[in-house]
């Protein structure tokens, strides 16, 4: 039972946090197999190594999730979108997924365009009522590009970050303690 629960938790925090083109694959499967032939002592929730095993499974799944995104048709970049400061985990996931699935955002990634307006647009299109655009901060890499809903002057460093193969974007809503992430890629000529 623990193995099934840990597999499901790890799938939810890795494979279910990726978007290549916003479509669900009909043939993706994750299996966990154990035959018990080694005769090792059974591990349960109270076992000292239980959390270590879960973290190992999650790390393997995260690496495989990244590979799926990087292998997406025509993908040239991978982007980790982190939405933090949300009132609940459901809405933070919803916002992160909406940004990750946005074609406007994905094409901006492809063009190395630090167009934070496309990020704000994807946040707003979730229609979550309590989001206050005037309190949103956005970081591209470690550089603040939007403070309290207002765009800042973009430095040349932002353009360098946008040309990297791996990019991190943080959206801080400053409304609560919940945080979620999505891994996504750009969409360019080869995808079309």
Locations of the language-model features?
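Short, small-residue-biased leader/transition segments that mark boundaries at the very start
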Residues: 2-4
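Long, well-ordered core segments of solenoidal/helical folds
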Residues: 8-13, 99
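Glycine-rich, charged/polar anion/phosphate-binding loops
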Residues: 11-20, 63-69, 121-124, 152-157, ...
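Flexible, glycine/charged-enriched surface loops at secondary-structure junctions
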Residues: 15-27, 63-80, 106-116, 130-135, ...
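Glycine-rich, flexible beta-strand/loop modules in the N-terminal catalytic cores of phosphate-handling
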Residues: 19, 24-46, 179-192
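A glycine- and small/hydrophobic-rich beta-loop-beta segment
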Residues: 32, 36-110
């Amino acid at each position: 039972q623990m193995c099934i629960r840990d597999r499901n938790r790890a799938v939810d925090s890795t494979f279910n946090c990726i978007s290549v083109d916003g479509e669900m694959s009909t043939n993706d499967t994750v299996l966990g197999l154990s035959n018990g032939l080694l005769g090792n002592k059974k591990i349960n929730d109270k076992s000292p190594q239980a959390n270590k095993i879960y973290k190992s499974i999650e790390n393997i799944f995260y690496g495989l999730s990244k590979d799926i995104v990087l292998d997406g048709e025509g993908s040239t970049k991978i982007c980790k979108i982190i939405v933090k400061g949300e009132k609940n985990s459901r809405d933070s996931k919803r916002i992160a997924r909406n940004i990750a699935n946005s074609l406007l955002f994905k094409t901006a990634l492809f063009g190395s365009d630090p167009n934070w307006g496309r990020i704000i647009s994807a946040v707003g299109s979730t229609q979550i009522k309590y989001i206050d655009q005037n309190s949103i901060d956005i970081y591209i890499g470690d550089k603040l590009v939007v403070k309290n809903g207002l765009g800042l002057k973009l430095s040349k460093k932002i353009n360098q970050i946008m040309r990297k193969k791996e990019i991190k974007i943080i959206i801080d809503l400053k409304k609560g303690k919940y945080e979620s992430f999505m891994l996504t890629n750009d969409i360019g000529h080869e995808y079309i």
